[in-house]
């Protein structure tokens, strides 16, 4: 059975670089996911982020979740719930403009820590994008530039808690989907599992590891790499007991008006004429408008819809 890729970045700047790049390439081509250790973010800092996130949930969100329609309604449910997720979340925007100062129920120390956390994750995301460029034979900075709209990239963090669920067979913590954006960095619970990815028709656990950062690729990297790398379906299962699962996912995405298309250098290398036409050219915001309505469906029809829209020309979008 294939082993989930865990990549140690400790020697990325010395004689271990070639091996690490090879591991990243294999993970991007065959998994769409990997887990990073020795990524440069101090363990003590991650411990602080985790503690403050858990404290905030208990103080501000736990009781609120128990009072939701979903929480109360599940008690009477007899059939599988397919239109909602068993999660308690809030979202922080970082780029192009931060909304952290406007989050009234976050205390000042938590705001400060999350701003610092976001900057560290932003730097790590950009470092990873350049490692992908190196593997792809693209110039350094190509992927970062590809994500730039008129205001730069979009970067935000989804903070999630998955409370214990009384009927885990009837509802998912988060339904199966691929991520729409670019590269996603996840700081997840190291004690409670639940995140799974779909590989070769089987659901495989993403192992909880203390102080690790899970990385997965979004739809936009599949397009830009002309299918060499793939976004992968993943989901979160619910748990019946324990303290619940914490998840902090940071999404480094294209700017809303960024124009996304396969890198010409990667298309030129592809001798298969049919494959050259698989991925469309589109504005990221247009893709997101489509994605929001069909997030929990297969990605391929989204690509086909964007390609059809592009082929119809300007009149179709007027």
UniProtKB/Swiss-Prot annotation:
Alphabetized UniProt keyword annotations: Ethylene biosynthesis, Fruit ripening, Iron, Metal-binding, Oxidoreductase, Vitamin C
Disulfide bond residue pairs: none
Enzyme class, UniProt record, top EC level: oxidoreductase
Binding site for Fe cation: 177, 179, 234
Cross-referenced Gene3D superfamilies: B-lactam Antibiotic, Isopenicillin N Synthase, Chain
Entry's Gene Ontology molecular function annotations: 1-aminocyclopropane-1-carboxylate oxidase activity; L-ascorbic acid binding; metal ion binding
Domain of life: Eukaryota
GO BP of this protein: ethylene biosynthetic process; fruit ripening
Domain annotation Fe2OG dioxygenase: ranges: 153-254
EC number(s) recorded for this UniProt protein: 1.14.17.4
Family the entry assigns: Belongs to the iron/ascorbate-dependent oxidoreductase family.
Protein's name in the database: 1-aminocyclopropane-1-carboxylate oxidase 1
Naturally occurring in which organism (per UniProt): Cucumis melo (Muskmelon)
Gene name per UniProt: ACO1
């Amino acid at each position: 059975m294939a082993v989930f890729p865990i990549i140690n970045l400790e020697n990325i700047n010395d004689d271990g670089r070639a091996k690490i790049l090879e591991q990243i390439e294999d993970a991007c081509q065959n998994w769409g996911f990997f887990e990073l250790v020795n990524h440069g973010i101090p363990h003590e800092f991650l411990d602080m982020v985790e503690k403050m996130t858990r404290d905030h949930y208990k103080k501000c969100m736990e009781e609120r979740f128990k009072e939701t329609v979903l929480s109360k309604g599940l008690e009477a449910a007899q059939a599988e719930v397919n239109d909602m997720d068993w999660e308690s979340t809030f979202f922080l925007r970082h780029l192009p403009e931060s909304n952290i100062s406007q989050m009234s129920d976050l205390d000042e120390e938590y705001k400060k820590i999350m701003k610092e956390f976001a900057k560290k994750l932003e730097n790590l995301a950009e470092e990873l994008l350049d490692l992908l460029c190196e593997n792809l034979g693209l110039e350094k900075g190509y992927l970062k530039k590809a994500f730039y709209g008129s205001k730069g990239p979009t970067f935000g963090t989804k903070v999630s808690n998955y409370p214990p669920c009384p009927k885990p067979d009837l509802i998912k913590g988060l339904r199966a989907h691929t991520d729409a954006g670019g590269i996603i960095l996840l700081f997840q619970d190291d004690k409670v599992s639940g995140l799974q990815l779909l590989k070769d028709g089987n659901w495989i656990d993403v192992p909880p590891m203390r102080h690790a950062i899970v990385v997965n690729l979004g739809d936009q990297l599949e397009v830009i790499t002309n299918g060499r790398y793939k976004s992968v379906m993943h989901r979160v299962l619910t748990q019946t007991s324990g303290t619940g699962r914490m998840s902090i996912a940071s999404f480094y995405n294209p700017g809303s008006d960024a124009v996304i298309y396969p890198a010409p250098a990667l298309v030129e290398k592809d001798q298969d004429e049919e494959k050259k036409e698989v991925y469309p050219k589109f504005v990221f915001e247009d893709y997101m408008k489509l994605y929001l309505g069909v997030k929990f469906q297969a990605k391929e029809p989204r690509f086909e819809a964007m390609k059809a829209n592009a082929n119809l020309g300007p009149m179709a979008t007027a």
